[in-house]
C-alpha cells in the first residue's frame, strides 16, 4: 500500500478548505483516508498562523513509515522545517523558442537594413 500525505478538499463552492491527510495513493482525492494530520485554509492571509496547521509528531511518524508527501504538502512541510525540499531548476524553459529566435533575427536584419539606408541617404 503506497501512502501519500496529500490534500483533501472541503469547504463550499468558491470557498476552499483543505485537510492534510494520510491516504492510500489509489483512493479518491476526497475519499477514504487513514488519518487527518493538518489543515490548510487558503482563504486566510499568508501571515495568519492558522492558515496552515500541522501535527508535526504524527507527520514525522508517517514519513518514517514511508508516506510520501505531494508537492504542495512538501512545500508546507519545508516551511515548517519538517522536510527538505530541493530547489527546482529548468534552464531550458527560460530559453526562447525556435520561432522567437527567427523573429528576432528578422527584426535585427530589418533594423540593420534601415540603418544602412539612412546612413547612405545622409551622405
UniProtKB/Swiss-Prot annotation:
Question: A single GO molecular function, which one?
Answer: structural constituent of ribosome
GO terms for biological process, alphabetical: translation
From the UniProt entry, list the residue stretches annotated as the region Disordered: 85-107
Q: Name one Pfam family in it.
A: Ribosomal_S16
Record protein name field:
Small ribosomal subunit protein bS16
Protein family membership: Belongs to the bacterial ribosomal protein bS16 family.
Q: Which InterPro entries match?
A: Ribosomal_bS16 (IPR000307), Ribosomal_bS16_dom_sf (IPR023803)
The alphabetical list of record keywords is: Ribonucleoprotein, Ribosomal protein
Top-rank taxon, per record:
Bacteria
> Which HAMAP family does the UniProt record give?
Ribosomal_bS16
The GO cellular component terms are: cytoplasm; small ribosomal subunit
Which species? Allorhizobium ampelinum (strain ATCC BAA-846 / DSM 112012 / S4)
Amino acid at each position: 500500500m503506497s501512502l501519500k500525505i496529500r490534500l483533501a478538499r472541503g469547504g463550499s463552492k468558491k470557498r476552499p478548505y483543505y485537510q492534510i491527510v494520510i491516504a492510500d495513493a489509489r483512493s479518491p482525492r476526497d475519499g477514504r483516508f487513514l488519518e487527518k494530520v493538518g489543515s490548510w485554509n487558503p482563504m486566510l492571509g499568508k501571515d495568519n498562523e492558522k492558515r496552515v496547521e500541522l501535527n508535526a509528531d504524527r507527520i514525522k511518524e508517517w514519513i518514517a513509515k514511508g508516506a510520501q508527501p505531494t508537492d504542495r504538502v512538501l512545500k508546507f512541510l519545508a516551511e515548517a522545517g519538517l522536510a527538505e525540499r530541493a530547489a527546482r531548476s529548468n534552464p531550458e524553459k527560460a530559453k526562447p523558442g525556435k520561432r522567437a529566435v527567427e523573429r528576432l533575427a528578422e527584426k535585427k536584419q530589418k533594423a540593420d537594413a534601415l540603418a544602412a539606408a539612412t546612413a547612405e541617404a545622409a551622405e
